[in-house]
Amino acid sequence: LIKEKGLGERGMYKIVDESGFVYTQYIYLKEADFEKMIVAHAEQIFGAAGIYFDIKKLIGTPKKGATIPDGYFLDLTFHNDPRLYLVEVELNSHDVYGHIGEQILRFGISTETDKYKIKNSLLAEVDKDSGKQQKLADYFSKSKYNNINELLDKVIFDNRPAAIIAIDEATDALYHVMSQLTMTTEVIEAQTYVCGDKKLHRFSPFKDEVITDLAPDIDADELDTIIVPAREDGF
């Protein structure tokens, strides 16, 4: 555990609970450990309305933009406007320009050249997961799509997939890189705080501005306007 290293542009937060215990930010040294936390809490971070696929398979053409996404998120927030996201899990210590920016560029190229492989990978995961099957069945009962093939054709072939970067600190440099990309890209900032053997996870939920304070009897599809709160200090 490193407590006071790599403060970045904004410095590290500390969290105090009701009992007065102080939690200090845990600095992940390995991307694999950070990714384990993201996957373990995928439903809370990405949203219970969608499905996270922990799939790591090469897509695209070797030497022509091939890449391996860290995962996929099928966003089912809107019953008639689903969307597929390729997920890139990163540490802020990595090169924002040479590594993260290049990965998103490769995502964009590969989603154009390897659509069928992406679809088949997702289908295979659904076929062996009853939980995903049930969530999709509930979705189909309220949407215009009748089955998983129709849904995946929509989000992969008809619409262009987007990207999500899950990172431990979202800096201005990251947002600058994103502004230069043609692929629609969202950022989720996630961090872990520790106090002895206790842990807390702090994150910016995906599409939180859409579903926060939404009454149970109101469908997200019925919203006419979505107001996104301004980002303060990159969060």
Regions found by a protein language model. Give the residues of each.
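Charged, terminal alpha-helix-loop-beta segments
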Residues: 1-235
